[in-house]
Amino acid sequence: MPIHELQNYRYRGARALVLLHGQALRGLLPVWQRAKAAQVRLPSTQDPNYASLESLLHHALRAARGYMTWLCEKLGLPDPGIDPEPEASRVEQEVESYIEHLLARWRLPLADVEETRFQTIHKSRWGEDMSLEGMLEHAVMHPLRHRFQLEELMEASEA
């Protein structure tokens, strides 16, 4: 665990979640790459985020960007300056540099926000009431869930 990183955070809980999000997103990539190499097929669905492995990775990156822009918006902070995610057609070629950019931009905005502000409740972009801390927790879990999903699909295809 990176115990010496981001020491300037006022709220250690936010610091922990920002660092955990980085670990989770970085951890998704090698699993996605193994799934791609194994030619894993996603379950059939009408959801365009599951049209292909590239679409799924694009979705995970778009969501990661969206969580931080939403947090900054609700906190009245400046836009975090995260570039738009690469399209599904380019995501495989650009994912590594994009993740580094995304995570570098994730590290900055929340450092001076005090703990009490993370407890405020807002409507998420999908209509659920969430605290800001809850959104950070959701951001950590999202890539972990997709990693788990891909690992299960690979395991099932080997059986």
Could you tell me what each predicted segment is?
Residues 1-7, 40-84, 122-159:
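Short, contiguous alpha-helical
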